[in-house]
């Protein structure tokens, strides 16, 4: 049994970030292989996110001390509870490094544990922050669920279909995108821009969604909360925008889009450059002019060919990610 212990605080909700997508995908693949796996939450009861992931086993614990009785291997997600485990535990670090004030606490989280990061960039940053050798970290790269690679592409459209599917949070570059959409060239080039209203589980996402309610320069579409719907959306898009203004540890959405045959224009920052499957265009972050240029370059390249998509699908595969996880856990 491999138990992924969700961190204290929020429940595991679909459509709220890469940590959720990554964890759910790992559990599904482990189960497919006949390896028992589950998501464990503390203090949420049945409101722990299981509604969003009906195909994944959830175990709701009342107290953190109950983690000590979990059989098999415990994998803490992002933050660890201060409890002993039957076997050596692991911690997987999806998030960015926090402020220096949290260094001692984060060092305590990794004590006597297998430490996993989700990109080379992220691993380097965490090694520096935690003051540990980079060689101590195991890199278990993210992936695209196979459904993204098998999603049927929509027929070509006269207008280029541009999609922003990140959360409506400032760090995801939503304000950079809005500045781009107000540029005259974007209003006259005939592209069709859609913005997914994801990230409304927190106040800032709700605020930005309300602000965009009557926005004239893009179509607002509801968030997709499962891989099938997300794969369909990407397969009906030509260019995905990821104008992040902070150094993301990786960027699973970039990989998913490329597997779906969608070109990606993303900020050249953090782990995003590592997501290149052959359909990625990198641009300077916080620079609307650079983002417009990147969009123009991606559009000029045209729709991805069947060969380009097949080559993209050979990168960041789910089975390879789970193989790396099992090696890191010595299983």
Q: What is the predicted role of each segment?
A:
Residues 263-266:
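Short hydrophobic beta-strand element within catalytic cores of glycosyltransferases
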Residues 18, 60, 300-330:
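A charged, aromatic-enriched C-terminal amphipathic alpha-helix characteristic of glycosyltransferases
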Residues 280-289, 296-302:
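Conserved acidic donor-binding segment of nucleotide-sugar-dependent glycosyltransferases
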Residues 21-25, 160, 169-183:
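A conserved mid-protein helix/loop that constitutes part of the nucleotide-sugar donor-binding site
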Residues 206-225:
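Nucleotide-activated donor-binding/catalytic signature segment of Leloir-type glycosyltransferases, i.e.
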Residues 103-107, 112-136, 144-146:
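A short, active-site helix/loop in glycosyltransferases that binds the activated sugar's phosphate group
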Residues 41-45, 165, 192-206, 223:
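Glycosyltransferase donor-sugar binding loop
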Residues 232-237:
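Short alpha-helical donor nucleotide-sugar binding micro-motif in glycosyltransferases
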């Amino acid at each position: 049994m491999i138990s992924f212990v969700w961190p204290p605080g929020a429940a595991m909700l679909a459509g709220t970030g890469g940590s959720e997508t990554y964890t759910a995908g790992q559990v599904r693949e482990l189960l497919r292989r006949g390896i028992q796996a589950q998501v464990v939450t503390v203090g949420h009861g049945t409101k722990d996110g299981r509604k969003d992931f009906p195909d994944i086993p959830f175990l709701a614990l009342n107290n953190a001390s109950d983690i000590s009785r979990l059989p098999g291997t415990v994998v803490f997600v992002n933050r660890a509870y201060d409890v002993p485990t039957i076997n050596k535990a692991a911690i997987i670090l999806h998030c960015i490094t926090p402020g220096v004030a949290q260094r001692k606490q984060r060092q305590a989280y990794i004590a006597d544990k297998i430490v996993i990061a989700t990109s080379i960039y992220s691993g380097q940053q965490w090694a520096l922050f935690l003051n540990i050798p980079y060689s101590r970290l195991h890199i278990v790269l993210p992936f695209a669920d196979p459904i993204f690679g098998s999603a049927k592409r929509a027929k070509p459209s006269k207008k280029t279909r541009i999609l922003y599917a990140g959360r409506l949070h400032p760090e995801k570059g939503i304000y950079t995108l809005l500045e781009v959409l107000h540029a005259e060239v974007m209003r006259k080039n005939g592209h069709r821009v859609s913005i997914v209203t994801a990230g409304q589980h927190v106040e800032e996402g709700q605020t930005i969604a309300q602000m965009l309610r009557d926005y004239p320069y893009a179509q607002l579409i509801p968030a997709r909360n499962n891989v099938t719907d997300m794969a369909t959306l990407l397969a009906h898009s030509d260019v995905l925008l990821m104008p992040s203004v902070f150094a993301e540890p990786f960027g699973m959405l970039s990989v998913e889009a490329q597997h779906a045959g969608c070109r990606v224009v993303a900020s050249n920052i953090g782990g995003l450059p590592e997501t290149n499957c052959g359909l990625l265009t990198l641009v300077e972050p916080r620079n609307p002019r650079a983002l417009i240029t990147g969009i123009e370059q991606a559009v000029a390249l045209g729709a991805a060919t069947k060969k380009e998509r097949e080559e993209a699908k050979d990168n960041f595969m789910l089975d390879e990610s789970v193989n790396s996880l099992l090696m890191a856990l010595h299983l």
